[in-house]
Amino acid sequence: MGDSLLADRRALVTGATGFTGSHLAHALRAKGYHVRALVRDPDGANAKRLAEGGIELIQGDIGDAEAIDQAVARMTHVFHIAAVYRTANHSDAYYERINRDAVGYVLEAANRHGVERIVHCSTCGVHGDVAEIPANEETAFNPGDVYQRSKLAGEMLAQEAARAGAPVSIVRPTGIYGPGDDRFLKLFRTVENGTFRVFGKGDIAYHLTYIDDMVDGLILAGEHPAAIGEVFLIGDDSYTTLDGLVAEVARAVGVKPPSLHLPVVPLMLAATACEFACRPFGIDPPLHRRRVAFFTKARAFSVDKAKDRLGFQPKVPLADGIARTAEWYRQEGWLKGSGKTAA
């Protein structure tokens, strides 16, 4: 494991029970770091898997400044991955508390405890719908929803700390996918069963990052001297189109890709109506405007800065990553022929 080489490196990972955070925590442990995870429920299944992997658990909530301070104590590295994502059940204030205020708590605690390196995980979504592709780290901000706005507010705190001399690095991932994540399951399932429909022309740009490459980028941001004070987009070597992504998924599940393209405006109107009807009751609407953005918002980025300055090199091309993800879904029983039913 190399513990003798990195025994003095102690890393806190927030969001370690989530998809990206769990992969990162295990990767750091494999490199020889002592890894600590801030978790709300140490008895939860994901937390238990961390503990089984030799990761220290400390109980607390990411929105609790005192809990964060205790978690940061005696750490040399902090990887702040925790965030709240898009659901209809959270208020705008909750997004701000977790995606902005908690960043401040992490930065303040890291400063108090003399942490050597801090990595803040932002999102490429701070750029919103990209007008000219590929975008880069200097592209104007254009957040399109409360999640993106709150993530931008958190990143601004990290940038401010970096300008003040804190050893902060900021990573903006493109769409993260791979084994362990079920956010793309609906796409795989509907393509497999023939019910997926492409709204719009299908030529909108789409940029993904396989989880192993994402973890490599995060670790480089936390270790490479050139990363301090900088912002890096992390993603695959190249972007694709929506039609290209769907074609890869179809290949991985063994079906022909859909050829029919439907108009997107009626779908957006339906999504808007669903959200307004469901929000007063705290119900997660069956259709979100954010889901419609999947068909309309361009997301394509250059990762040249990370490659040139950090030596970042994506290793898993889209076709391989999609195939690996499909295989994991099969193993979980979530695709046809696997004999199980998804939770």
What are these regions (language model features)?
Residues G144-S169:
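Active-site Tyr-X1-5-Lys
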